[in-house]
Amino acid sequence: MKENYNYPLDLSWSTTEMTEVLSFFNQVEKFYESKVEKEVFLESYNAFKKIVPSKMQEKQLGRDFELSSGYSLYHAVKEVKASGKRFVSADKA
């Protein structure tokens, strides 16, 4: 993980929308750095998807976030959805 990085945000979003998107990015960071509660993570992802409904835009934001932070939105969402556990974290193999 990089120490300081920028979040990919769309300046046309409202303050509330930016807050929701940042909250989801924070959940992804938490997934990689410690652990997340599955329900909270998925609620945050669903709020993110209401703001970013386009798969193409989601992939672009995910690529930009990964280039900036080193964290993959795609893999975080995939692992959390597939997990049967209440708390989930990235496998640190």
Swiss-Prot record:
Pfam families: UPF0223. Transmembrane segments: none annotated. Belongs to the UPF0223 family. HAMAP family: UPF0223. This is UPF0223 protein YfdD. It comes from Lactococcus lactis subsp. lactis (strain IL1403) (Streptococcus lactis). The gene is yfdD.
